[in-house]
C-alpha cells in the first residue's frame, strides 16, 4: 500500500528531544571570579537551560552576583567542595549536568560541544577536557597546564582504570549521578570530589568516561600559589585513593574494565 494511508500506518522515526543542560558552579567568597564566569555562560552558543550556583557559606556578595545573573542559588552550609558539588548535582534539573568552578573561563561553544558529544555517544556517562592556567606567566603557564593535565589524566587514569573527570571542566548524565549519589564521599572535605566521583562512575559503568582535548577552558592556577596548597592537594589525593581502593582495588578495577571491553 502506497500513499498517505501507508505513511500514516508506518510513520517515520519520532525526533528525539534535545537534552536539557544544567551548569553547576560551587562558590565560596569568590564573587569577582563568579561574575566573569556567569557572563561567559550567558554568551554560550547553546545557552544552558539553567545555571545552579551553590553558595558554600560565602561572606561576600557571591549569592547576590549569582541572582543578578539569573542563576538559581542553592545554599550548602557544610563546608567543602564535595558537599557543595553534590548539592548542586542534586538540585540540577537537566538531563546533562555540566560542572565548572567560579574561576573557570569557558569558551563560547562549551555547552554546545558537550551536548553534541553526549548526543552522539549514548553510552557516554562522563566527559572532561583540559585547562589552561590563565593567571600564570605565558610560557610557564603553558608548561604547567600541559604537565598538570598529563599527570592528572594518566596517573589518575591508571589509579581508577579509566578517564578521571576534572571538576573545573566536566559533565555527566543526570541518570549517572543518580546512580552514584549515595556512594560518593560527599561529606568528606578532605577528598578531591572530581576524582572521587570518577571512581564511582567507573565502578558503576567501566570505560564510560572520556577526555576531549578540544574541550579546553581557562582556570586559575591557585594550586601553584604556595607550597602549603600543593601539600594539601597531595594529601587529599592520597585520601581519595585510599578510600576508593579500599572499596575496590586497582587490579580489580582494571579486570572489570577489560571484561567490559570484551563484551559484544
Task: Describe the role of every protein-language-model region.
Residues 39-48:
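Short, acidic, metal-binding catalytic loop of nucleotide-sugar glycosyltransferases
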Amino acid at each position: 500500500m502506497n500513499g498517505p494511508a501507508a505513511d500514516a500506518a508506518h510513520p517515520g522515526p519520532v525526533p528525539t528531544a534535545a537534552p536539557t543542560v544544567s551548569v553547576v558552579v560551587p562558590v565560596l567568597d569568590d564573587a569577582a571570579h563568579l561574575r566573569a564566569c556567569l557572563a561567559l555562560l550567558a554568551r554560550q552558543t547553546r545557552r544552558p537551560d539553567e545555571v545552579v550556583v551553590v553558595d558554600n557559606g560565602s561572606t561576600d556578595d557571591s549569592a547576590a552576583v549569582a541572582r543578578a545573573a539569573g542563576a538559581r542559588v542553592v545554599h550548602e552550609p557544610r563546608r567543602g567542595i564535595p558537599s557543595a558539588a553534590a548539592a548542586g548535582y542534586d538540585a540540577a534539573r537537566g538531563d546533562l549536568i555540566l560542572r565548572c568552578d567560579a574561576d573557570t573561563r569557558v569558551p563560547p561553544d562549551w555547552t554546545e560541544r558537550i551536548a553534541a558529544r553526549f548526543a552522539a555517544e549514548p553510552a557516554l556517562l562522563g566527559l572532561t577536557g583540559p585547562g589552561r592556567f590563565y593567571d600564570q606567566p605565558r610560557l610557564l603557564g603553558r608548561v604547567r597546564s600541559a604537565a598538570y593535565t598529563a599527570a592528572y589524566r594518566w596517573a589518575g587514569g591508571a589509579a581508577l582504570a579509566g578517564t578521571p573527570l576534572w571538576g573545573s571542566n566536566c559533565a555527566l548524565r543526570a541518570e549517572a549521578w543518580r546512580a552514584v549519589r549515595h556512594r560518593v564521599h560527599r561529606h568528606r572535605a578532605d577528598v578531591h570530589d572530581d576524582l572521587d566521583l570518577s571512581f564511582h562512575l567507573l565502578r558503576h559503568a567501566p570505560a564510560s568516561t572520556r577526555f576531549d582535548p578540544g574541550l579546553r577552558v581557562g582556570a586559575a592556577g591557585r594550586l601553584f600559589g604556595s607550597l602549603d596548597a600543593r601539600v594539601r592537594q597531595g594529601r587529599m589525593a592520597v585520601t581519595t585513593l585510599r578510600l576508593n581502593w579500599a572499596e575496590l582495588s586497582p587490579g580489580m578495577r582494571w579486570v572489570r574494565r577489560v571484561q567490559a571491553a570484551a563484551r559484544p
